[in-house]
Amino acid sequence: MWGQRLFAGTAVAQSVSFPGLVQMDEDTHYNKVEDVVGSHVEDAVTFWAQNVSKNKDIMKIGCSLSEVCPLANSVFGNLDPKKIYGGLFSEDKCWYRCKVLKTISDDKCLVRYIDYGNTEILNRSDIVEIPPELQFSSIAKKYRLWGLQIPSGQEVTQFDQGRTFLGSLIFEKEIKMRIKATYQDGTVIAQAEYGTVDIGEEVAKKGFAEKCRLTSGIDACEAKKPDPNQLALRSLKNPIPLWGRRSNQSTFSRPKGHFNGRLTLDVKYETSAGNHVTFPKESLAAGDFNLGSNVSLAKIKQDQKLIEENEKLKTEKEVLLENYKALELKVEQTAQELQQEKTATMDLTKHLESTLKTCVGTRLKNLAAKVELLKEIRHINISIRFGNDLSDAMQVLDEGSFTTLASLNELEKIWAEYNVAQEKIQTCLNENEGNILIAERNEVQQKLFVAVDVFILEVDDLPLDKRLKTLQDLATSLESVYGKAKEGTNNSEETLRKFYDWQCTKREEFASIRSETEASLQHLVAWFQSSQKVFDLSLDEPLTSEDLIGNIDEILEKTESCVCKELELSLIEQGVIDKEIILSTYSQVLQKIHSEEKFIATLLSKYKDSVEFKKQMIDCLNKNPNVDYLLSIKKTLKGLKAQLRWKLVEKSNLEESDDHDGTEIEKIKQEITQLRNSVFQEIYHEREEYEKLNSLTQKWFPELPLLYPEIGLLKYMNSGGLLTMSLERDLLDTEPMKELSSKRPLVCSEVNGQPVLLKGYSVDVDTEGRVIQRAASYHRACGYAKEESGLLPLIFLFLCKSDPVAYLMVPYYPKANLSAVQASMPLTSEEALKVMKGVARGLHTLHSANIIHGSLHQNNVFALNREQGIVGDYDFTKSESQRASVNAMVGGLSLLSPELKTGKPPSASSDLYAYGCLFLWLSVQNQEFETNEDGIPKVDQFHLDDNVKSLLCSLIYFRSSMTAEQVLNAECFLLPKGKSVPIPEKEIECTQHSREDESKMESLDRYSEKTRNGEANP
């Protein structure tokens, strides 16, 4: 690309208008002559040229673009091919006017620089909008040589050669164009002349073009004209010669002149307003030709050769100039470095001169400071560096270790035989075989008793407590020094051998260095003592100073070296290998300590068991436990139940007689009440005796169920102490609970002043055992946690003798389930938190025992005193899956988790989902729920406490990672520090009185229609 480039510092500092350029004269007349300068060549017959009269206009355009384009916005969207834009030319980074010929991709376009004719592919970021005053016709015109066309089938190489040849004839030269015609796209057909040379004829002579046939004329040439876009792309792929790619452009602002008919080169530089304006050195001054002179093709070639030589010389000059500047910079840097070295050398010389004056004093002071430090270090115990404490610890372990005990081995052997004998008795079902096993067990028992006695006596003589205290102190001391031990260390003997070898080597090295230090210091002291004679003027005997003084420098050097070596060994941190050896040994020592501690703990535990065994066996040896007391209780119960039945019949007869006495009936009622209390008192005594026998059976006498099948001990044990054979329904004063009996028989009664419910379960031979087993599992889980279980306790389980019904007795809390509480007086947010924390505790108790509730809903969750939440029991005749298959609803919200709806088995996660829905129902009161397509409620629609909302989201949306224990520890359930829940005494009294009233007056109250379909205690 040639022509005027942008001037970074042009004098034009204001906007420029272009009168006369807005509408260019496109009217051409036949044989009209124009003087133009070639700017770009497309092929052997087509080129672009600028009118020589537009020189100043090109300069103005460049100045304006240099001011406008850097601040303009890059184009976006679809580009208008008719619109003029500003384009950043890649070779000189200057702005020129251009039009978009083709969009190559989303971020690249093919453009033509309209004032020069050349093309380029630009990024969109290099194309900008320009103002309307720059939107006028192009300076350059497209010309086509008259009467010529590109031969059909021309090869690429010949095409490029023709393009290059035409460029050598017209590029940056002033030529005359005789206009013959104009195409519709604006291409001017003209005859080109350079002096006396007909450029078209020269091109045709070279064979790069052929003359059009006379019959076709302009139309034939038009038909041969290639697609301009294809020419543009081909021009990009085959760039024009060197003159088409120069970074400097020829300008027409330079004056023209003649020097004896020869061409002149414009090499002058101009400045304007203090800024550097560059004019080309190599461009030929257009218009310097005498059009009447004889110019030959040889002259043109000579000019071209001069241009190429000039370009080459210019390049060499620039390289030499750059080398010169680089060498000049290097010389300056070397001079600076030399000056810095001189300064540093002078400073060092001054420092040495000043230090030499005090060299001896400074050296002795430093040595004295090091010796003083060495004294302190020698007083400090540095045994840790050589593992002396580990050696001492291993000596302690070896001297008084307890690693084995002969009596313990014998005891464990006999105890194992004893346990096997007990297991055989426990699994025996035949009484005769059982007697044989009992006799064998008793023999082993005698041997065990003797072994226990020997073991106890031997352990009593051992100082176990003292040894354990020594080991604990030793471990604490080592851990304070070495920290955490390595895990997984093996091959203790190899580790200890390496440690002893390393320790010996280090001790020898340290002893050698220490002796060298002491010897060098003694040598220095001896020198000071001997040198006193040399400097003592009172001595008359002649002394040779050279012999007495000796080489003090060598003595000082030796002393300093030895002292520094010992300091380095004492102070510098140990190496990786040393640390590895010490830590491995420490780990082995600690393992031995813990191993012996574990052995002593085993001894003490076995000693405790042996003492207990000996104590109990002294009372039980060769003597079976007595069940007579249990049988007497059963006999007493039998009599009391007979009296109670008789009194019930007597009361019934009196009530049915016509002349019954009310006083006598009341007296009988009191007697019945006393008899019932006596019956339950004896039942509780019976349970206590069963519990004692159960404990003896578990520990010492597994034969009790086999020897005394009549007492039913095995059934009691299998039920976890819940089953009783002494209780019958007709002994209780019951009232039917019809409103709660939609699913099973349900009656209310009172035991020892406490209202209870009797739940009836229809059972047969197959289901009876499963009901007992499920109830026993629930009862055991409740018993493990005791008062903190969060579960509704089970009081008794008994079987009806006349009907296939199993009755379960549980406490009765009238109107305490969540359904009734929310219907009468809804819980506040604080009360709901207390209640749901208790419910979470109940679920945690069940889940810890691997029990899935599967039937959690508002009718079997209770709010006692509106602050204690407990989880009710469930239907023990049903499995987990059967219980979970019932779709309970609360407030229009299903408590069935999404996984249960898809047929998956119930799990702790499904219990937590029901819990979360109940918690949400309590938190939002009567607000309506929005659910997604799976029926899961949307929690975000409600305004809740942040901690409560976080817990609900975890329960409802992310249950797979939640447990009941995590729910218990949720932020919303944690009380602020120093704050407790008050329980006033008056409130307790009121609660007790209300319970008494409810047990008598409200047991037959009807629930509302909302609770009629559920159960208070399912």
Curated annotation (Swiss-Prot):
Chain sites annotated for binding ATP: 717-725, 738
InterPro entries (UniProt xref): Kinase-like_dom_sf, Prot_kinase_dom, Ser/Thr_kinase-like, SNase_OB-fold_sf, Tudor, Tudor_TDRD8
One cellular component (GO) term of this entry: cytoplasm
Organismal lineage: Eukaryota, Metazoa, Chordata, Craniata, Vertebrata
Region (Disordered): 988-1018
Protein family according to the UniProt entry: Belongs to the protein kinase superfamily. Ser/Thr protein kinase family.
Sorted UniProt keywords: ATP-binding, Coiled coil, Kinase, Nucleotide-binding, Serine/threonine-protein kinase, Transferase
Name by which UniProt lists this protein: Serine/threonine-protein kinase 31
Keyword ATP-binding attached: yes
Enzyme class: transferase
Span of domain Tudor: 78-137
GN (gene name): Stk31
EC number(s) given by UniProt: 2.7.11.1
Single GO term (MF): ATP binding
Any coiled-coil regions, as ranges: 298-358
Location of the Protein kinase domain: 711-1018
Catalytic reaction(s) noted: L-seryl-[protein] + ATP = O-phospho-L-seryl-[protein] + ADP + H(+); L-threonyl-[protein] + ATP = O-phospho-L-threonyl-[protein] + ADP + H(+)
Tissue: Testis specific. Expressed only in male germ cells.
